[in-house]
Amino acid sequence: MRAIISLLLISTMVFGVIEAVSVEEGLKIFEGERGGCVGESQQCADWSGPYCCKGYYCTCRYFPKCICVNDNGK
């Protein structure tokens, strides 16, 4: 009985490690697919892209025309 429980626990841990590695690789692929970024006053969409470059953030004051604005060092 203990052997079966030990085997199940080990199998679960191995599966968990494999799954974690798969998710991490998937995130790396996703980051690579994001592509380039857009600069100030260019149209953006945080949820689907294009994304704002570093130093800018996407604001949707006039939805659906969201634009990148300078974060002024915030």
UniProtKB/Swiss-Prot annotation:
InterPro entries: Beta/delta-agatoxin_fam. Keywords: Amidation, Disulfide bond, Ion channel impairing toxin, Knottin, Neurotoxin, Secreted, Signal, Toxin, Voltage-gated sodium channel impairing toxin. Expressed by the venom gland. It holds the Pfam family Toxin_7. Residues 1-20 form the signal peptide. Belongs to the neurotoxin 07 (Beta/delta-agtx) family. 03 (aga-4) subfamily. Aga sub-subfamily. The presence of a 'disulfide through disulfide knot' structurally defines this protein as a knottin. This is U3-agatoxin-Ao1g.
